[in-house]
From Swiss-Prot:
It catalyses: 3-deoxy-alpha-D-manno-oct-2-ulosonate + CTP = CMP-3-deoxy-beta-D-manno-octulosonate + diphosphate. GO terms for biological process: CMP-keto-3-deoxy-D-manno-octulosonic acid biosynthetic process; lipopolysaccharide biosynthetic process. One of its GO terms (cellular component) is cytosol. Belongs to the KdsB family. Keywords: Cytoplasm, Lipopolysaccharide biosynthesis, Nucleotidyltransferase, Transferase. The gene is kdsB. Pathway: Nucleotide-sugar biosynthesis; CMP-3-deoxy-D-manno-octulosonate biosynthesis; CMP-3-deoxy-D-manno-octulosonate from 3-deoxy-D-manno-octulosonate and CTP: step 1/1; Bacterial outer membrane biogenesis; lipopolysaccharide biosynthesis. It is found in: Cytoplasm. The keyword Nucleotidyltransferase applies. This is 3-deoxy-manno-octulosonate cytidylyltransferase. GO terms for molecular function: 3-deoxy-manno-octulosonate cytidylyltransferase activity. It comes from the Bacteria.
């Protein structure tokens, strides 16, 4: 089951999930991509998103406006839907309308092998890594996340040295091996690191939970601001989305 948490009043770009992407609302684009892989449900926090999904025949449920994270919203949706305890749950984003089907499939496969949860990352360049909107991740020898940050990690102390490890940009999608793991994560108290960085995935690392990271090839970009949207519409084309 794929859940897409969709919040109307995003702090940096209000109503962005309803913005037009080549003739379809952004959240509808995201859901159509997800439905190519598995059954998808949008977890809405507002009737306007719910009505938009229904208009385009996208399954949706109405959740509380008061969740602290998309993961918490996913859990409420899972509870409303009555998913079985052993069913895998993927948490995709409502602001990733250009996410490729292949990336979702890679996450699904990684989730099967993850002891707790899985996510994805892609290789990025130094210029991309400078943006605090693009979260970076560093891995251990088993491809588990060591840390996620909006800062540049790993930092290259010797600027003349050749970088020995690629910079990895996090793709904010998550896979949970089963419903119980999702419940376990949401039951943990928020930690200071996630509050500082505003990154919910740091809660899992703080409590020593493993996040398996699958490195993928992706041209997708998350839409955090109006500028992001305008830039993306210049890069992508309707033909590319109708794959």
């Amino acid at each position: 089951m794929i859940i897409i948490p969709a919040r109307l009043k995003s702090s940096r770009f209000e109503n962005k999930v309803l913005e037009d992407i080549f003739g379809l609302p952004m959240v509808v684009r995201c859901a159509k991509n997800a439905n190519l892989v598995d059954e998808c449900v949008v977890a809405c926090d507002d009737e306007s998103i719910m009505q938009t999904c229904q208009k385009f025949h996208i399954k949706a449920v109405l959740t509380s406006k008061h969740h602290n994270s998309g993961t918490e919203r996913c859990l409420e949706a899972v509870q409303i839907l009555g998913l079985k305890n052993d069913e895998r749950v993927l948490n995709l984003q409502g602001d990733e309308p250009f996410l490729e089907k292949e990336v979702i499939l890679a996450l699904l496969e990684a989730t099967k092998n993850a002891p707790f949860m899985a996510t994805c990352a892609k290789v990025i360049d130094e210029e991309q890594a400078k943006s605090p909107n693009l979260v970076k991740v560093v891995l251990d020898s088993q491809n588990n996340a060591l840390y996620f940050s909006r800062s540049l990690i790993p930092f290259l102390r010797d600027f003349d040295a050749k970088r020995q490890t690629p910079l990895l940009g996090h793709i904010g999608i998550y896979g949970f091996h089963n419903k119980e793991i999702l419940e376990e994560l949401c039951a943990l108290k928020p930690c200071v690191l996630e509050e500082i960085e505003k990154l919910e995935q740091l809660r899992a690392l703080y409590y020593q939970k493993k996040i398996l990271v699958k490195i993928v090839q992706s041209q997708s970009v998350g839409i955090d601001t109006q500028e992001d949207l305008q830039n993306a519409l210049k890069i992508f084309s309707p033909d590319l989305l109708e794959r």
